[in-house]
């Protein structure tokens, strides 16, 4: 069953996000630190009539990395060509993309950490000096061909910056850490989405929905659609705080934005491992989830909310988690 609080895209959400996508930095809600930096760097590059330094955007899924890439291209007034790490399977794929770039273009590579190393190495000279050397032919007839590239800006997006090689990471002149959204910013996003799709929502209801959306716009917009359905069938169409609470409760989204999987993780740690410490691999096996899924999808929010701590000996449940789930807490010595 698809998880309502999944950070990744579900179904037709890609087309929905394109509809909601802001065009310029002034329209982009949240991520103020990244925006303020980019505003200066972009304006400086435009005044010098140069391409913008290469940009690395990293952070959990659903926080607007792809949207930010399109906004950067719009601010620069250039075209954006989009691909992803898994889609670039061999060197020839990347060469074809690079050879198709116009001066100043933005090349956006999502999930850049998933590029094969043989492909990644071609990027080094392309990013640093705007050229590539490729081998044509095989055996004794092979020869090296030098291709000059127009100045361009590479924007890489990743949820796992630690998996990037040092040589690739070092070639990004600008890095932007996309963080979980503050509730106030997320409330504004919910109200903007409701306005675009002609929904009627009370400000307090938008705040309640935002508060339980894990600091993630993608999740907030998904929940808004489900709450709208609930309001239409169980009410008069108006999205109120009461309707929002009832709808989210029906969807198993609790007051802290946790769903049944989050609670399963915490309950397992408390009931089976006495609150920890427990290793990530052991925990993953016990709850029947992939290790990477637990580490990338569930754990970051639980840590951010103060329900789990990482220690040298494993993961530990905090007193806050005990209290939230109604377990008695005894401090360990």
From Swiss-Prot:
Mg(2+) binds at residue 66. Belongs to the RuvB family. It catalyses: ATP + H2O = ADP + phosphate + H(+). This is Holliday junction branch migration complex subunit RuvB. Keywords: ATP-binding, Cytoplasm, DNA damage, DNA recombination, DNA repair, DNA-binding, Hydrolase, Nucleotide-binding. Residues 182-252 are annotated as: Small ATPAse domain (RuvB-S). The keyword NAD does not apply. The gene is ruvB. It comes from Streptococcus equi subsp. zooepidemicus (strain MGCS10565).
């Amino acid at each position: 069953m698809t998880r309502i609080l999944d950070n990744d895209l579900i179904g037709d959400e890609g087309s929905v996000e394109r509809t909601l996508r802001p065009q310029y930095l002034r329209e982009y809600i949240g991520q103020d630190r990244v925006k303020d930096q980019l505003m200066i760097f972009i304006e400086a590059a435009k005044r010098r009539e140069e391409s913008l330094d290469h940009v690395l955007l990293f952070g959990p899924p659903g926080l607007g990395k792809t949207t930010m890439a399109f906004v950067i291209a719009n601010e620069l007034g250039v075209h954006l060509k989009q691909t992803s790490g898994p889609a670039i399977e061999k060197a020839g794929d990347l060469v074809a993309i690079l050879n198709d770039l116009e001066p100043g273009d933005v090349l956006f590579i999502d999930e850049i950490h998933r590029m094969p190393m043989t492909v990644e190495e071609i990027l080094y000279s392309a990013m640093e000096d705007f050229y590539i050397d490729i081998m044509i032919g095989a055996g004794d007839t092979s020869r090296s061909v030098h291709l000059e590239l127009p100045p361009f800006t590479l924007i890489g997006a990743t949820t796992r910056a630690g998996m990037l090689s040092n040589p690739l990471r070092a070639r990004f002149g600008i890095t932007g850490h996309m963080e979980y959204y503050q509730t106030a910013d997320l409330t504004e996003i919910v109200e903007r989405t409701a306005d675009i799709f002609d929904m009627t929502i009370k400000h307090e209801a938008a705040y309640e929905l935002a508060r339980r959306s894990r600091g993630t716009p993608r999740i907030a917009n998904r929940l808004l659609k489900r709450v709208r359905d609930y309001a239409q069938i169980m009410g008069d169409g108006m999205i109120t705080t009461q309707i929002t609470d009832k709808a989210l409760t029906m969807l198993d989204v609790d007051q802290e934005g946790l769903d049944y999987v989050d609670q399963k993780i915490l309950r397992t740690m408390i009931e089976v491992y006495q609150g920890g410490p427990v290793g990530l691999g052991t925990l993953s096996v016990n709850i029947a989830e992939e290790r990477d899924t637990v580490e990338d999808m569930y754990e970051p929010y639980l840590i951010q909310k103060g329900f789990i701590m990482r220690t040298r000996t494993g993961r530990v449940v905090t007193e806050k988690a005990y209290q939230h789930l109604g377990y008695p807490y005894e401090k360990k010595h």
